[in-house]
Structure formats: C-alpha cells, structure tokens
C-alpha cells in the first residue's frame, strides 16, 4: 500500500476533505514514544448521523478524555455520513497527513478492512471502535459485548411476553447487513428467542440502520401478520423507534413490546410513555474513555491492556445493562446518564412523575 498511486490519491483526498493539519507531533516524535509524555494527532472516524450518539456523545466524550490524558494531543474528527466511500476518503486523508493513531467506527466493516491495511502499512495503529472488522485484524478493539446485547434484549422481551401470557410471534428487526457488530447482535437476538414459544414471523436486515427503512418494512409485515404480532425484537433504538412508529400508524393499541439498544433520549422517552419495552444502557463514556486511553497508550509506544481477543484483535469488551420502565430511574437518572430536564419534557412529564423521576 506504499505505491505512488496510493500516495497521490491520499494526498488529493487530504487537500479536498480537510486541509492541512498543523504540525502537532508526528509518529517519530521521540517525546511521544518514550513512555513519559504523549503528543500527536488521533483521527476519530465515526460512521453516520442516523444515530444521534456519535455527534452528541462519542465525539465530545472522546475529545474530553484525550485532552485529560494528553494536553498536547489533537483529535481529527470526521463523520462518514453512512457512506463507505466517503469514510475511505476521510481515512486516506488522515493517513496522508500523518496522523499517529486512527480510531475507526466503520460504515461498512467489510470495506473498512482496506482502511486498516492502509493505515498499518504506514505504521499507524488502528483502534476499531464499537464495530469490529472481522477480515483484517486491527491493533485494538473497544466495544460492548454485541452478541450479549442481542441476547439480553431478546430474553428480556421473551420474559415480558411470558409474564403477560402473550400469544403470537415476533418480528425480528436487525441492523445493517454491512456492519459486523450488527451481525453479532443478530446472532444474539436469535439465540435469545430460541427455545421460547414465540415463532419468528419475519426477519429484516435494516440497510444502514435506517429507522425509516425499518418502519417501512414493519408496516409491510403488519399487513401480513397484524393479529399475530406479539412483539418485535429491534436491534437498536433507531430501528425500534421505526418499529413503534409503524405499529402506531397502523392503529395497533396498545403497542406490543418492542426492544431497542443505545439508550437514546427518544428511546427513554418511549419507555416512559409505555411505547418501547426496553433498551440497553451502555454508557458511551465507557467506550469513549477506553478508546482514548488506548490511543494515548499507542502514542507513548505502549500496548493498551486487553482483557480478551476477538477476530484476532486484542480487545476490551464491556457488559451493558437492560433498561425497562422498572429500572429506568435507577439506571439512567440516578446514575446521571441523563437528567429529568433532558427527558421529561412536554407529554413525557406525567410519565416521569409516575415513575418518580424528577
């Protein structure tokens, strides 16, 4: 990957996409490699804006932690807007400008193997973030246990349906088919449903995790299975929100239990309103901080501490928590992930009061 053509393309992308970075410490900065003091530039490449978390949580939390650990470090942030080609250009640009570490949450985890290879060819360590890249080992991986997440939300839903003595089957609304993390969640979702009395009525891999595409698909399934839908296992809060919207638009009342994942504000509001059954609390601060710590360790010439290995990549995997109306106050508000002022607005104020959230 050190060919002339690659260098020309990368430099061109750099000029077009980002401009020139200030010389703030390069990979051969001796002070940053002696284990005493880090300096340099970390590229932080996020996948999309379909989920609000990347702009509102991941970016500021990562940047804050890097600043705490390394005053002289700079973060180069880019969002791929759900376009793998755009993210490839952003990565090429960062590599051409000589970033010291690349943190990557891939739009397309298969296509992003090229990004990993290109960076490593320039001796730039790559930290895969949230979504694993299965076909090309990165230098480090930080995430929550995605397969475990899928199993947890599905088992939680099955337990709820059993308690309600529900009949019928389930709609399975998975994440993006080009996201390896989504495939792990999907595997867990299926495992969580297996052995229950609830048949999987239909399954859907949601392109780009797009909530509208999930909503459109669920609307189509309602015409086929309307009276047989006991619930829906949705892979994240975006697809869960799309599922809820489709069920409400079809006049299904009450809305059957629907799962989610990410604990977005809108999902917490739906849980409080009784429109979504569960979500997953996986505080972004945990993975953002872990990724920042790993990046700064690489800048110091150190190896980040791994607790396991996944897809031949040293990894840190954290355990999340299921959130329902029963524990939302404790998990979300008492732990100050969100405040009542952020969530208990307008129509949600009464539900918050009922749950003791103030």
Feature-to-residue mapping (PLM):
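Bacterial Sec-type N-terminal signal peptides, specifically the leucine/valine-rich hydrophobic h-region
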Residues: 18-21
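A residue-level marker of the well-folded mature domains of exported/periplasmic proteins
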Residues: 2-7, 13, 23-358
């Amino acid at each position: 990957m050190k060919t002339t053509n690659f260098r020309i393309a990368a430099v061109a992308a750099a000029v077009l996409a980002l401009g020139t970075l200030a010389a703030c410490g390069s990979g051969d900065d001796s002070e940053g490699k002696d284990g005493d003091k880090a300096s340099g530039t970390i590229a932080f490449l996020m996948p999309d804006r379909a989920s609000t978390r990347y702009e509102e949580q991941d970016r500021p939390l990562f940047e804050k932690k890097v600043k705490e650990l390394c005053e002289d470090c700079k973060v180069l942030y880019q969002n791929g807007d759900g376009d793998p080609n755009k993210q490839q250009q952003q990565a090429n640009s960062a590599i051409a400008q000589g970033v010291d570490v690349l943190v990557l949450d891939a739009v397309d985890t298969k296509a992003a193997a090229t990004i990993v290879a290109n960076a490593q060819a320039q001796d730039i360590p790559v930290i895969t973030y949230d979504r694993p890249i299965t076909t090309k080992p990165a230098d480090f991986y930080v995430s929550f246990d995605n397969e475990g997440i899928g199993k947890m939300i599905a088992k939680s839903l099955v337990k709820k349906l059993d308690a309600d003595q529900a009949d019928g089957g389930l709609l399975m609304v998975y994440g993006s088919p080009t996201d390896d993390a989504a495939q792990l969640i999907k595997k867990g979702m299926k495992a969580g449903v297996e052995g229950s009395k609830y048949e999987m009525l239909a399954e859907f891999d949601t392109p780009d995790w797009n909530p509208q595409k999930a909503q459109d698909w669920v609307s189509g399934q309602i015409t086929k299975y309307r009276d047989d839908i006991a619930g829906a296992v949705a892979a994240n809060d975006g697809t869960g929100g799309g599922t809820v919207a489709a069920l409400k638009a079809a006049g299904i009342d009450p809305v059957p239990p629907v799962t989610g994942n990410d604990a977005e504000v809108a999902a917490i509001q739906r849980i409080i309103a009784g429109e979504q059954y569960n979500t997953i609390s996986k505080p972004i601060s945990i993975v953002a901080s872990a990724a920042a710590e790993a990046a700064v360790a690489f800048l110091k010439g150190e190896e980040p501490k791994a607790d396991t290995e996944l897809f031949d990549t040293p990894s840190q995997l954290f355990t999340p928590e299921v959130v329902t109306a029963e524990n939302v106050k404790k998990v979300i508000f008492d732990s100050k992930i969100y405040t009542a002022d952020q969530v208990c607005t307008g129509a949600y104020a009464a539900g918050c009061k009922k749950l003791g959230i103030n």
